[in-house]
Amino acid sequence: MNETNVGLDFRTLNSRLTIEADWYYRLTQNAVIDAPLPMGAGNLLGNRGEILNTGVELSFNWADKIGKDFSYYIGANLTTLHNEVKDLNGLSYLYGGSAEFRTISQVGGELNAYYGYDIEGVYQNAAEIAADPIAVANGLEPGDFKYVDQNKDGKIDNKDRVTLGSYIPNFNYGINLGFSYKNFDFSMVMQGVAGNQIVNRKRGDRRWHSELNYDLDQFENRWTGEGSTNEYMSAKGSVKPWNISNFNSFYVEDGSYFRIQNVQVAYTFPKKDFGKFKMPSI
């Protein structure tokens, strides 16, 4: 592990305001990768990769009092992450995931990025089908997906697959706040991520499990005729191999979220004096 951290801590206004900033650089050498053996003898896990993670960590905290009974605080933090494959034992890429939900690690790209076909829309009418040699060659109909022919060779095959996103967030962030008033205390922690993608496995698993229902969004917004949608396939198309047998961008969704992680409300009962017995505060 080759790691460098540079940080700065700053306090001002009688320490009511605290700011921390850190830059980190972590190059994991001898990372475990599943690399192929010579002569097609399968794969073998080994410490032969290099993975870089770098970014900044920022935090801001403010704490103060108003009068003698009320105190409060608020804080926020942000972490950025750049993930990059630097070396794969001399290889330019390695496949991962499963045959159905393929991932790829490429030198210069992110680790285990989603890898499949990019959808640019839905065929809307017969004229559009007739004008597209790819649609004609594959017997497509209105309501079927239109894949991007990445290399412009007039067909859709493995050479048209591209990275469709990564499960690794570019940003992690959080907010915490609270206050105390006499015997009452309140605190809240919120947290979120952004810049990552997730795979909707339920949509993908319908390829093998026809008893699974559509999700509500897909059902309500399915293609029902020209101009109805350019994002969802038709009901008929949802069982056609062209649309569902290849891992594509339809299964990849935004993984960003923001949530309230914890809320706490407390009351501290004051001490009570019962003669010789004194009950502590609770």
List the model feature ranges, each with a label:
Residues 15-17, 68-74, 171, 182-184, ...:
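Outer-envelope beta-barrel architecture signal
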Residues 46-49, 63-166:
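Conserved small-residue
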Residues 23-29, 62-64, 78-84, 181-183, ...:
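Transmembrane beta-strands of outer-membrane beta-barrel pores
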Residues 35-42, 89-99, 203-212:
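Flexible, surface-exposed loop regions and adjacent strand-edge segments
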Residues 1-40, 79, 83, 143:
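Membrane-embedded beta-barrel scaffold of Gram-negative outer-membrane proteins
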Residues 1-18, 44-67, 107-116, 166-171:
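Outer-membrane beta-barrel signature, preferentially recognizing the C-terminal barrel domain
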Residues 193-282:
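Extracytoplasmic gating/loop element in the C-terminal half of outer-membrane beta-barrel translocons
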Residues 6-10, 21, 58-62, 175-181, ...:
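Residues on the lipid-exposed face of transmembrane beta-strands in outer-membrane beta-barrel proteins
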